[in-house]
Amino acid sequence: MKTKDNEVINSESEFSEKDVPNFIEIKKINKTYPDGYVAVKNINFEIKKGEFVTILGPSGCGKTTILKMIGGFELPTSGKILVNKIDIKDLPIQRRPTATVFQDYALFPNMNVEKNIAYGLTEIRKPIENVSADYQKESEKYFNDCLKKSKSKIKDIERKRDGFLKDIQKLENKINNSKILSEVNTMTEEEYEEKIETLEKEYFEKNKKELHKSIPVKVKFIEFINNTLSFFRINKNIDFKANETDELVQTYLKYEKAYRVNLITKQEIDYLNHKAADLDYWVSYWQNYPYQEKEWFDKKKLTRKLTKQEIKEEVQQIIKIIGLEGKEKKWPSDLSGGMQQRVALARALVIKPETLLLDEPLSALDAKVRAQMQQELKNLHKKFGITFILVTHDQEEALTLSDKIIVMSQGKIQQIGTPNEIYDLPANNWVANFIGKANILNATYLKGNKIKLFDNVLNADSRYKDKFKENEEVNVMIRPEDFDVVGKDKGKIKVTVLETTYKGLMWELICEFEGVLLTLEAVNKVNLEQEIYLTWDDEDMHIMKKDDENDTYTDESSEFLALTKNAFKKKIKEIKSKKNKNKVNGKKGDKNDN
């Protein structure tokens, strides 16, 4: 199911656009480190209150960076992190409505389990009982006054920012409306140097002398001044008019002048963009101002810290929920990885955050404990009803736990959807290969919403109607479990079995059809080099654009794939050679029999 903003919602969950507004909105978030490394680029997504969202991707894709920016451990280079429509990206960690469970648990080694869990409660406050109604009114009035001041300040800031944006637009128009400036603007440094070298070479071939020696001293002096101004980042440029009759000299001077003007204009644009970005901080500050001021006011007259007894009761309650009874006095070093994880979860949940951030919390656990903790997380999410944001590289974990999955690669979002959509309807070849196992095959989209695959003309699912051009080359994905091993009369293709692996419930087969490798699952055992027949349902074919730009692998995985394919190609040759020998021997045998 999709919302009007095309946000994908899990059809099995209780969420719908009608009754649950966006709780967290990530808008145009970018993170570039001082060394120039771009961790995430133009990230946008929304999260509903109470959703379990997983950010999934390989190492280095930017998923943990996003989690850290939501939690306040990293500051974005640009963009907004909205919670209930208020930008929190500049708020300190302790003022954010989040709690984080780290990959290494980050338990205090000098505190026992009980004290670790209680630590965050020392700063939690609760309303004072039987408080005067006058204080309540005073608090409300103070908040409204702060809100009024906040709106006025934000209005002034928006006016300033609009001015900066108009100036930026004027400078961009200056470049775009000039043919020579626009041309130079699209050039790289190498391309520009190559253009100048070409002009100098042409001039030398025509006049048998160096070009710069023919340029008047006055022009060269002005060029020297402009270069000096540029070096010291002074946004000024001394204009000059060259009364040169030689066309090559005129062209050279025109490009040099355009380069200088373009450089200065871009510096001005960068400066104005920086000023506009600075204003984002103040918008965020004034949006949060009334709430922080109210919190300060309430601390004095309306709220109090928890008593020792109340803290003890809260700790005992969460210990019972998480399953840590009997471990209260133990030290973190005395606990197993699974138990340490429970303590970290208890410490985060006891403060009742609106959002729980989970940074690959199960990655250090063994398979059995990890499976148990996955179920625990699911139960805790259901019990507390708060928003969970999990970061992981484990596809099975993401598919098992999530209402929504955000798939990332190389700092960009590849797809957002429910587990079913991500698995059955991947957005591109990269997602198809990353999530589970996939057979990605070459096919042709035909008129009448049909697909030509392996010389079979098949009906495509109705969802693909008018999505592709007639006779367009496409990729078709079929998951291993969607193939059925059948008899000859029902089979669409005949394949040769190259490898069999027993997986417990199923056999995994790697087969060959006309040089194409297929991975499939079968209930019954088959023999190596056996020929079997396969079929599949039309709705099991997922059609994608061919040669998608996202269809990339890491060097390590591409090397592995190449080695695997080469090994099977060798095996295919051996099988074919063996078959040919058998045929030849069979014919010889027939002759001998005669």
From Swiss-Prot:
One of its GO terms (molecular function) is ATP binding. Its main location: membrane. SMART domains: AAA. GO terms for cellular component: plasma membrane. Residues 125-304 are annotated as: Insert. Coiled coil: none annotated. It is a peripheral membrane protein. Residues 24-435 form the ABC transporter domain. ATP binds at G57, P58, S59, G60, C61, G62, K63, T64. It is found in: Cell membrane. Keywords: ATP-binding, Cell membrane, Membrane, Nucleotide-binding, Translocase, Transport. Its EC number is 7.6.2.11. It comes from the Bacteria. Pfam families: ABC_tran. It catalyses: ATP + H2O + polyamine-[polyamine-binding protein]Side 1 = ADP + phosphate + polyamineSide 2 + [polyamine-binding protein]Side 1. Belongs to the ABC transporter superfamily. Spermidine/putrescine importer (TC 3.A.1.11.1) family. Part of the ABC transporter complex PotABCD involved in spermidine/putrescine import. Responsible for energy coupling to the transport system. The complex is composed of two ATP-binding proteins (PotA), two transmembrane proteins (PotB and PotC) and a solute-binding protein (PotD). This is Spermidine/putrescine import ATP-binding protein PotA. It comes from Malacoplasma penetrans (strain HF-2) (Mycoplasma penetrans). The gene is potA.
